[in-house]
From Swiss-Prot:
It comes from Schizosaccharomyces pombe (strain 972 / ATCC 24843). This is Ribosomal RNA-processing protein 1 homolog. The keyword Transmembrane helix does not apply. Keywords: Nucleus, rRNA processing. Its main location: nucleus.
Length: 217
């Protein structure tokens, strides 16, 4: 099911009101219980990327980051992983073209999506096995930003994820972090990556949860 081209163009419009209105329509569009293809979401993220690109004021950047991450639970569950997977694919593809003045807002956007993933895991684990939901997300991350065979994926994104991972995890589980394979994507990359910089730097930047005080389901 393809997103209409005019709709995507409105998301990347120069006029902020046009972009905001398109974003409201997007919520209804994504909530449909209809299957999307990978290309559909890649086209959509192209528009959303430039929507973020043109956000020039800090408060609006924060609001937009929150609004985009808030799309995750709105997306029909059968499309949810693909929606996030294509987000990370878009970040990896566009990263080298982001100038230094825009880097921080995209770091913020990635932080919000990391948090949205953890919240979705928490919500879904109320009706499904936690390990199963975490495994589904881990597969998405290891096929995407943590794919060790993708030598072109920017180190900066992985370093940022290492910096924020546990912080965002603890926000979702402020008291007890349930036992699960939360760090499997990092462990896999550290173990198998041919990138020496990643193997040496990721362990130093990753602040792991030292103890689990709550068993998984």
């Amino acid at each position: 099911m393809s997103a209409p081209s005019p709709f995507i163009k409105k998301l990347a419009a120069n006029d902020r009101k046009t972009r905001d209105k398109a974003l409201e329509s997007l919520q209804r569009f994504l909530s449909q219980k209809k299957k999307f293809e990978r290309l559909d979401f890649l086209k959509l993220w192209k528009g959303l990327f430039y929507c973020m690109w043109m956000a020039d004021k800090p408060l609006y950047q924060q609001k937009l980051s929150d609004n985009l991450a808030a799309l995750v639970p709105i997306v029909w569950i059968d499309n949810r992983i693909l929606f996030q997977s294509t987000f990370w694919e878009t970040m990896g593809r566009e990263w080298t073209g982001i100038d230094i003045l825009r880097t921080d807002k995209f770091y913020l956007l990635m932080r919000r999506f990391c948090a949205a993933a953890f919240r979705d895991i928490q919500t879904r684990s109320k009706t499904a096995l936690l390990d199963k939901v975490v495994a589904e997300y881990n597969q998405m991350w290891m096929d995407g930003p943590f794919n060790t065979e993708n030598l072109a994926f920017p180190n900066g994104i992985l370093f940022h994820l290492a910096d924020i991972w546990t912080e965002e995890l603890r926000k979702v589980y402020p008291e007890d972090v349930p036992k699960a394979d939360w760090y499997l994507p990092f462990d896999s990359t550290i173990k198998s990556s041919h990138n020496v910089v990643l193997r040496k730097t990721l362990p130093k930047r990753l602040d792991r949860v030292s103890e689990y005080t709550k068993d998984s389901q």
